[in-house]
Structure formats: C-alpha cells, structure tokens
C-alpha cells in the first residue's frame, strides 16, 4: 500500500482537528455542498476521507494511518517531511480548512447561534485564497461563489469575472428574462379577457343576484335568532349545572362527615367490646383463683374446726362468707368483685389470727 494520500477533487478539504481525536494527523474531509457561506459539521461526510501522519507534530502521538506523504493535484511535488510539518502548523495555527483550489474556510472557536438557539455556522468561508505556492505552487486557484451570509441565496461568482465568462452568463440570464417577460404579457392579456367576461356575467345576473342576496339575508337572520335561542338555553343549563354541582358538593361533604362520625363510633364500640372481653377474661381468671383460694381455706377451716371446737360457729360463719364470695366472683360485676375481694381479705385475716393465737392447731403441738 502506498504511503501517499492523494487530494484530487475540489470537495476534499484538508484540516487539522482542534480536538484530541486525531493528534499529529492532517485529516481530509469531503464537503457535501458548496451552495452557502456558513458551513456546519453535518455538511461534511461523517467519516474522514483519509489522514496523513505528520512525524514530530505532536509529541507522543501514535500513527492512525499508513500515509506519510501528501499529493495535491496541481502541485508538482509530493509534500512530505518538513513541508508536511509546515502545512500542519499553518492549518492548526489559523484554524484553516483548505481544498486543492485554495478555497479556505475558518473553523470558529464557538459555533454561531441565532436568537432561537439554532446553530447557524461552525465554519465560515473566507474570501482569501490559500497560497499553495509555499508548497510548490499548486494551480489553478479559484474563488468561492458568493452567497448571502448564513443563507443559500446566491449573490455572484467572482471566478466567472476572472475567467472572462461573465458575459456568457449575462446573455443567458437576459434570454431567460425576455422569455419570462413574454410569458407575463400573455398572462396579463388572459387576465384582462377573464375580467371582461366576469363583468358581462355580473350585468346579466344583477336581478337574480338581488333576490338571492335577500334570501340569504333572511336565512342568516333566521339562524342568528336560532343561535341566540340556543345560547340562552345553554346559559340556563349552565346555571342549573352549577347549582347541581354545588348541591352535589354539599351532599358529598355531609356524607364524608357522617362517614367520619360512623368510623369514630365504630372505633369506640370496638374499644368497649375489647374492654368487655378483657373484663370477662379477667373475671374468669379471678374466679378460678378465688375457687382455688376458697378450696384451700375450706380445707384449713375443716382442719381447725376438728381441733378447736370453740371456733366451730365462727368457722361456719367464715364458710358461709366464702360461699358468698364464690357467688360474687361468678358475677361479671366490678362492685361484686370488689366485695368478694374484701370478704377474701377478711377470711384471710381470721385464719391468720387463728394460726397466730393457736399454733398447736397448725402444727399439732399442745401448749
């Protein structure tokens, strides 16, 4: 594969990218259109046409291409070594993009944006020419065709003046202008004829037109009245709708209030049910405990009554109280439970007194 990259078409432009994408390389890009003065990146083909590695241009750069020399059509010599490095520095310093005809574009440091934020230009075509004479005198040099700035409206082509071909272009334009003028004259005559025919038709149908206009006016007045009726009916319907909407909102508010009250009552009812269930459970536990306690006390009373006849009557009273206590515990009643607990305390006090005053009853030891 040859190490020479050839640039032999005017749409191929040489550039040194200002980004770090291709360090140490001169890249060649293909321009898709010449018909405007402001150029965007999108006006170039997305991938480079080719690139040439410049030895010593950027320290530490790695070759991304096998090309080491550049051949530009019109230059008798191949550009390489120091000339290639000189071309690299010139393009990089002035941010220039140039083709084989010396037509130059300048890369903007910041894109040109209009008031709407739309990017209008990233490269501007320059009226100067690139002097390929510094690199062997490439010929021919050509000037850009001129367009209104940031538009595609053509102005003129200075190169035609330099080439002496401006007269040919002017003659062609004059012929086209005469042809257009002839067509305009013919069209004017056709328009005048049509206007004459229209005026004749209007004169012949004047009477018919007046009756038609009267009928149309009556129809318009009728529909105006119908429209007003419809408008009045619509306003009444709208008032009723607003009234119904207010009543609906008020009813929804009352429903929400009742729902909130029902939820609150349901919450209190659930609490009361839970309290009742807790009370029943507690009463059951108290009754079971009281039954056990009463059984123990009955056993002791039987034991004491056998050993101490003098206490038999008192023991009988205590047993009766214990029976009453058991009855009270069977009732789910807070006051009854309190009375049962009081009797329980009284019975325990009596038994404690018996055990304290007559220990031989408990231990079976006579004094």
Swiss-Prot record:
Keywords: Coiled coil. Residues 165-202, 235-308 form a coiled coil. Expressed through leaky scanning mechanism. About one third ribosomes fail to initiate translation of the CP and therefore translate the P39 protein. Might be involved in virion assembly and vector-mediated transmission of the virus. This is Protein P39.
């Amino acid at each position: 594969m040859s190490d020479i990259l050839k640039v032999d078409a005017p749409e191929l432009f040489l550039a040194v990218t200002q980004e770090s994408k291709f360090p140490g390389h001169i890249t060649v890009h293909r321009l898709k259109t010449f018909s405007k003065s402001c150029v965007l990146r999108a006006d170039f083909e997305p991938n480079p046409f080719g690139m040439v590695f410049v030895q010593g241009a950027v320290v530490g750069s790695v070759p991304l291409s096998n090309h080491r020399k550049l051949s530009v059509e019109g230059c008798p010599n191949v550009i390489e070594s120091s000339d290639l490095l000189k071309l690299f520095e010139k393009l990089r310093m002035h941010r220039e993009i140039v083709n084989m005809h010396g037509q130059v574009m300048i890369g903007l440091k910041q894109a040109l944006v209009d008031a709407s934020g739309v990017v209008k230009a990233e490269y501007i075509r320059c009226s100067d020419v690139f002097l390929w004479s510094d690199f062997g005198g490439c010929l021919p040099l050509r000037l850009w065709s001129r367009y209104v700035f940031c538009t595609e409206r053509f102005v003129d082509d200075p190169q035609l003046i330099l080439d002496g071909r401006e007269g040919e272009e002017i003659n062609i334009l004059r012929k086209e202008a005469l042809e257009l003028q002839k067509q305009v004259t013919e069209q004017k005559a056709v328009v005048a004829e049509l206007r004459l025919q229209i005026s004749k038709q209007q004169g012949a149908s004047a009477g018919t037109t007046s009756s038609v206009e009267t009928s149309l006016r009556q129809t318009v007045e009728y529909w105006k009245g119908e429209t007003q009726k419809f408008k009045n009916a619509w306003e009444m319907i709208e008032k009723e709708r607003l009234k119904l909407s207010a009543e609906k909102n008020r009813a929804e508010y009352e429903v929400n209030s009742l729902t909130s009250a029902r939820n609150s009552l349901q919450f209190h009812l659930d609490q009361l049910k839970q309290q009742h269930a807790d009370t029943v459970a507690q009463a059951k536990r108290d009754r079971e405990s009281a039954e056990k306690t009463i059984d123990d006390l009955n056993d002791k009373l039987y034991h004491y009554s056998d050993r101490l006849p003098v206490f038999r009557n008192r023991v009988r009273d205590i047993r009766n109280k214990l029976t009453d206590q058991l009855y009270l515990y069977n009732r789910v009643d807070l006051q009854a439970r309190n009375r049962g607990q009081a009797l329980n305390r009284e019975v325990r006090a009596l038994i404690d007194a018996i055990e304290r005053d007559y220990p031989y009853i408990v231990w079976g030891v006579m004094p």
